[in-house]
Amino acid sequence: MFQILEAAKVINHTEDEISFEKILVIGLGQLGLPVAKYVKEKGFDVYGYDNNERALDNAEKQYGIKKIDNFSDIDVFIVCISTHREDDISSPQIDGLMAITRKIAKEATNGKLVSIESTVPRGTTRKMFEILEHRFHVVHAPHRWYALEENVHGVNQLRVIGGVCDCCLRTGIRFYDGVEHAEEKENLGYYRGNKSYKSLGIPMYSVSTVELAELSKIVENADRYLQIAFAEDLYMFCKANGISFTELRDAVNTKWNVNILEPRDGIGGHCIPKDTRMFLESSEIKSKILISAQEVDKDYRKYIERMIKDVNQINH
């Protein structure tokens, strides 16, 4: 309750206070570049910030997104920074996120909107709010962008959003979902903003706390981890017992509420292993089923390595 009251006091929020004109996308990689492109297509004045000069040059060359170094004139900050270690993409790291938060706190104008789209451990957004000294509207709107199906699972799809306080949440929903949608949200019907404000037109599902929004993303990927690990475990079971995994999977998947996945070369990528570790590290009570799933994936990787080695020996 203290943070809600303090935010309302320091931000000095009024319902019609912020105009969303000048948008800065921080991080122009696999996630940030499509976000910047989408925001620009919606008619906003979009700029980019990235430590990688090649990423900045690429954004300007492809979409005309200009780079900017000073944050003083920005209305909305959309943060799309990677939250994994450079030398180990399965390990979470938020040092870059904290550094950019300090830059916003130092240079930006009070009362602006800061939206974290990066996947973060539980409690991170509120830590950022503290670094920002309660002077900004801060929300977490985790991305659901999927590169292989961008047309279906791109920037504009149903998303979860949470704010560090009610006024932050209202402002975030107005930017993403639009005033008309905001008025339809439970407990947000009293909001009446200026309908001339543009929005991204992205449907948002609001939750009661920013921590719930943070958890929603990492739980999504932890659930995916479990599904893949089960497929890996079942594959090894079938091989050990002379059963066709494909035939069994196809038969089981005829049931309407079952969808066993196809195991491949282990659980990898930038998101699923890292986010599963975020979930495991989010509580002193560890998820036994996820820990077991990690062991299954390790066993499966070793199993695949042995299979490849055996095939190579036969071919030679």
For each predicted feature, which ranges?
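Structural/interface elements that position substrates and couple domains in central-metabolism enzymes
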Residues: M1-H316
